[in-house]
Amino acid sequence: MTASTEHRLEGLEPDNLLAFLSLLGLLRALEAAGWRPRAYWEGLPLRPVLRLREAKTQEQVALTAAEGCTVLARNYQFAASGEFKLSIDQLKSHLEAAINCSPAEGRSADACLSAFVVEGSLAKDLKPGKHAFARSPLDCLGGGQSDLLSTLRDGLSLLGQSQSTANALAKALFAVWKREDDRKSLRWDQSDYRRHAYSAKAPTKDHARQEWGANLLAIFGSSLLLGCATAGGRSKLSFLVLGSRLVDGSGVEVSWPIWLHPASTSGIQALLAHPGMSEDQPNRDILAALSVSAVYRARKIWPNQYAVFTRAEVV
């Protein structure tokens, strides 16, 4: 296949939270492998474009991203335990371990953890022996944090097979998703919402299949959505991540920009942190000065015991 400094990522639709996080994960993985990638959005239908400093083929992009994923996976040691019932002391132990690493490794490990748990956000009904911290906005699973960690482990499980990983990443990035993988889901893809009334099959045998490569990249991309504790007050949610906002007291929405000029992960983080991203009606003139042409927003809903993020809409 022809080498190029730009690759259109046909699999990553702009109105899908999983696809957006996958884009962030791709950039992080390539950075971890020593590249200096950028991305921007263009065309009809709208898709992100990966820009590289040197011409590479799609196969080289996927293989290098797989190598970067293996490097990034070292930051997810907190997911190795069978259950995710962290006490305050256990979380402090993880944070101290990150501090004792090199500055870059420590920041990466802390960022990966903060997307799912932060020290200042305690559970409302704190009980001995139970998980001490509030649910992350990105946690859509109904069985508590043990479900979350089990799903993270499942997403990381095939990383030892570099060629298989590269093939899965290429499918997720360069082709329309077929969702053929029978794996666990973090439920960041709106297709995970399945209605079972009048279904020909039992729900347990007719669950939504996944695009595993996209889920893998999204795990790493989520670390750019740094978590923090909120003031709480009357809200039931005391934990937000970058790009998210509270709605209706306890609901949560996640917003992300569409930018027209090549940006790195640091630049994208800065856009996510812009105050205009959380406004009901973002000021288009202000955002246009930052090359942002649109803002997409998805809402977390609970149709049953599991949450899911809706298809995003332009606001």
Language model segments and positions:
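Generic structural hydrophobic/aromatic packing signal, biased to beta-strands
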Residues: 148, 152, 186-188, 256
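Elongated scaffolding segments in large macromolecular assemblies
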Residues: 2, 9-14, 206-209, 213-216, ...
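Conserved small-residue
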Residues: 1-174, 192-194, 218, 226, ...
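A residue-identity detector for tryptophan
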Residues: 35, 41, 177, 188, ...
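Generic structural signal for short, flexible, solvent-exposed coil/loop and linker residues
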Residues: 141, 177, 200, 205, ...
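Short linear interaction motifs
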Residues: 130-134, 179-207, 223-224, 229-236
